[in-house]
């Protein structure tokens, strides 16, 4: 569990001896495109609050989304006015526009429009979108025309994060009739978490994190959590001031194959995996555990017929071996050949 980097002795027991979550349990029966409930266990005591609070803060503050940043209404010079033939005043119309949820697949600002001329209710479904923008809640009420008049609007949509008040859109050109809007970019509607007790064997002093996420539909709850975890990982990885290595169980030091976890040299066929998972790994040309752990989870999910169920199965097995996806093993193929030669000589 010790290895050297230059003159420093790195003690990997600091992280290797901690219990690690086996998998994220996705409650598929209750989950929808806008709601997700996830269980994450086992965790060391106190980690439930630490991880839950960090994820919640990042989910609510840092994910990108689309929103209106400005509107122009034909015949209207400012928001503190009324429009003849429309029930709502301009202030109420703007409040309704802020409730329209959008999805956008580009970072470039987009311009949309709305035109109606018949008496009746105007909703977000009347907004004329393009190939880059989708209205997620077309039923959202915008205005009520009490007579046959023309209502024309032009919108600018941008990507952003968090909440940006109208006065912060400083780069928008000041012009008569342009009304800047407060923009709520966050695709997350709400996040809650609770920490419960978890059991590992006969020990019950572990945490289970139960996380619930509500989104506007522009991102799935599962992806929202994944993005937030990635943000946290990227922000704190700068504190790791050494190259991570995989230390063996015997505390050996050195640069040969002896300082690696022996499980890395196992063939895929030696693992107690389902036939489906094994076949998926073969189709991805993965023949050893060492090759497997150097893959990223996202890359594995791109493999044909490889789904979340197979991923969770393999992650649980790797965890039991003290391994995980995304590991860095310099010169693994060379070390694997050395290990095979050693096994051959010993036989």
From Swiss-Prot:
Reported function: DNA-dependent RNA polymerase catalyzes the transcription of DNA into RNA using the four ribonucleoside triphosphates as substrates.
Name this protein carries in UniProt: DNA-directed RNA polymerase subunit alpha
Reactions catalysed according to its record: RNA(n) + a ribonucleoside 5'-triphosphate = RNA(n+1) + diphosphate
Sample GO molecular function, one term: DNA-directed RNA polymerase activity
Residue span of region Alpha C-terminal domain (alpha-CTD): 255-347
Keyword Nucleotidyltransferase: yes
Comment, domains: The N-terminal domain is essential for RNAP assembly and basal transcription, whereas the C-terminal domain is involved in interaction with transcriptional regulators and with upstream promoter elements.
E.C. numbers: 2.7.7.6
Positions of the UniProt region annotated as Alpha N-terminal domain (alpha-NTD): 1-243
Keywords: DNA-directed RNA polymerase, Nucleotidyltransferase, Transcription, Transferase
UniProt record similarity statement: Belongs to the RNA polymerase alpha chain family.
Domain of life: Bacteria
One annotated GO biological process: DNA-templated transcription
Gene3D superfamilies assigned: 5' to 3' exonuclease, C-terminal subdomain, DNA-directed RNA polymerase, insert domain, RNA polymerase, RBP11-like subunit
CDD domains per record: RNAP_alpha_NTD (cd06928)
Quaternary structure and interacting proteins, as annotated: Homodimer. The RNAP catalytic core consists of 2 alpha, 1 beta, 1 beta' and 1 omega subunit. When a sigma factor is associated with the core the holoenzyme is formed, which can initiate transcription.
GO cellular component labels: cytoplasm; DNA-directed RNA polymerase complex
UniProt organism field: Lawsonia intracellularis (strain PHE/MN1-00)
Enzyme class: transferase
């Amino acid at each position: 569990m010790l290895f050297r980097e230059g003159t420093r002795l790195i003690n990997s027991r600091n992280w290797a001896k901690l219990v690690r979550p086996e998998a994220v349990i996705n409650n598929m029966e209750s989950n929808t495109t806008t709601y997700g409930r996830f269980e994450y266990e086992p965790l060391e005591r106190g980690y439930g609050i630490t991880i839950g609070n960090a994820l919640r803060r990042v989910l609510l503050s840092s994910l990108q989304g689309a929103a209106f940043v400005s509107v122009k209404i034909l015949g209207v010079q400012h928001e503190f006015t009324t429009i003849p033939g429309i029930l709502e005043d301009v202030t109420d119309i703007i409040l309704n526009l802020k409730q329209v949820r959008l999805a956008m697949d580009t970072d470039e600002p987009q311009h949309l429009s709305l035109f109606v001329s018949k008496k009746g209710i105007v909703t977000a479904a009347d907004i004329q979108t393009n190939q880059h923008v989708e209205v997620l809640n077309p039923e959202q009420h915008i205005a009520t025309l009490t007579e046959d008049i023309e209502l024309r609007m032009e919108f600018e949509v941008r990507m952003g994060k968090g909440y940006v008040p109208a006065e912060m859109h400083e780069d928008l050109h000041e012009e008569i009739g342009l009304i800047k809007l407060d923009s709520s970019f966050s695709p997350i509607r709400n996040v809650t978490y609770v920490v419960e007790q978890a059991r590992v064997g006969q020990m019950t002093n572990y945490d289970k994190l139960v996380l619930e996420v509500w989104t506007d539909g522009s991102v799935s709850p599962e992806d929202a959590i994944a993005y937030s975890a990635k943000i946290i990982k990227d922000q704190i990885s700068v504190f790791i001031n050494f190259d991570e290595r995989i230390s063996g169980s015997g505390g050996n030091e050195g640069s040969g194959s002896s300082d690696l976890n022996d499980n890395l040299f196992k063939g895929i066929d030696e693992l107690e995996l389902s036939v489906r998972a094994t076949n998926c790994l073969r189709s991805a040309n993965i023949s050893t555990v060492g090759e497997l752990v150097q893959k990223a989870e996202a890359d594995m999910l791109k493999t044909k017929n490889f789904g979340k169920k197979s991923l969770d199965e393999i992650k649980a097995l790797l965890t039991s071996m003290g391994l995980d996806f995304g590991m860095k093993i310099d010169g693994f193929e060379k070390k694997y050949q050395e290990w095979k030669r050693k096994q051959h000589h010993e036989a």
